[in-house]
Amino acid sequence: MGLCVEENITMLQKRSDTLDRLRHSLAHVMAEAVQALFPGTKLAVGPPIDYGFYYDFSPPRPLCDADLAPIEEKMRAILRAGCPFVKEVVSRPDALARFKDEPFKQELIERISADDTLSLYHSGAFTDLCRGPHVQSMRDINPHAFKLTSIAGAYWRGNERGPQLTRIYGTAWESEEDLHTYLRMQDEAKRRDHRKLGPALGLFHLDEENPGQVFWHPEGWTLYVAIQQYLRRVMHEDGYAEVHTPFVMPQSLWERSGHWDKYRANMYLTEGEKRSFALKPMNCPGHVEIFKQKTRSYRDLPLRLSEFGSCTRNEPSGSLHGVMRVRGFVQDDAHIFCTEAQIASEVTRFCRLLARVYADFGFAQEQIRVKFSTRPEQRIGDDATWDRAERALAEACEAAGLSYEHAPGEGAFYGPKLEFALIDTLEREWQCGTIQVDYQLPSCERLNAEYVGEDNQRHMPVILHRTVIGSLERFIGILIEHYGGAFPPWLAPVQAVVIPVAPAFLEYAQHVARELCARSLRVQADVSAERMNAKIRTAQTQKVPYLLIVGERELRAQQVAVRPRTGPQHSMGLSAFSTFLLAKLETRALHA
């Protein structure tokens, strides 16, 4: 029996105070087990995370998946002792003495002020440097409700130039039932993995020699273009003017925009005629340059410029993930040039647009989560300007009736932002849309954008950076996993396959496909030498929404036997089927 995803996933929480304590405590138990089994192992850090925990080690030999089971057994043996978790507060010198043989702990301790105290947690004979909190006792941990899941590489403090560590991940829950539900979720996630489904469905492939770049095949590019055309139409209806800006722009522009100082490490650089250039990591400076090419009036505002902008970012190879984290991608990017008084109405308008688009792709209002991200430590602009930007966005949220989670310090370097995450079938969050308030980029200190106000004086516009789905590549990866490759008819690269029952009906199958294609439907005829049942299996494996079976009866009646992806088979005339399918596409129906 398959996993009933909707029923099971909603039972689980990613995080809670109780789960964090339990998982944090198990990270300590795992560290004790690893040091017992592999003497000489040095400890780094081990926090709780969504759905589980991890610990980073420097072991005396490489660890592999075969080591996970013995570590689990050792952890259960430690838990059977039932030791309490006991906190001890110590001075910095005392902590350094206690961890004299642990170089990573020593580095952490040395970063603490000499006058500060630190906390240690003891559990039996094991001691770790830790803020806590933990469960009171190992008896509070169900020894059958956790599992070690994987081993990966990691760098100390995330620095690629630092020591390489071994990271062991685990998942932990309050009950065995929750553990088993989570593991079934993970099995389902593996079946839906876009890195497997994408190539299997003929959508794309990835090349190890060219990491972070996607090769789109005909079916995948059909899906890509369908999404792009839909978004283009929606943006046009909402008052956006589409533009296109250069892929390569000079260092001087990136310096003035502030990207050169804040983002240069992630930019691809090139030189020509003794000048430095960069492949654009984002589109905003180009849109400002378009805005500046003529005198703008307050009557021109708000001005909404959109672009399917090709961007590149030099992401670390270890962070690349299928089509969801790549080095070359296209964004449904747009910038709204407006007055400060127009911020609230434009944010409200954008939120309506975003909800409409997400609904068409199959994400209801309750599957959208909003995060309000405020000023980060590394930023441009003064605090007074940031105060105005954050206040304006907060007022816009109130006007739009948005409830949101507050995320201090997670804003863009030039302004605060709202981030919109989609909750997929497996209850995972995917950050997609964003709208960001920017007083910095258009300022005279940066790109110097101006308009003439009602008072006939020059004023600086506010820029709202916004995207609905973000990277098209990433969004397609999300859709593949959300639908398991079984796309709604309007998105399916092939909407129907015509299958003849015997070679005698190949010509009619081709006729049916031609007629339906002429009505702007994506239909193919399978004229291969395979038997009918093999053709049906192939089409089902490719998750085609409709199979159209044709034989003697269908030829005589000029009909097709329609076999939808779900539901019974029935006969329809060609005109009736095309009308039926076109209605599905027009309404963007989610089911065949």
Swiss-Prot record:
It is found in: Cytoplasm. It is an enzyme of class 6 (ligase). Disulfide bonds: none annotated. It comes from the Bacteria. Keywords: Aminoacyl-tRNA synthetase, ATP-binding, Cytoplasm, Ligase, Metal-binding, Nucleotide-binding, Protein biosynthesis, RNA-binding, tRNA-binding, Zinc. Binds 1 zinc ion per subunit. Its EC number is 6.1.1.3. Residues 193-488 are annotated as: Catalytic. This is Threonine--tRNA ligase.
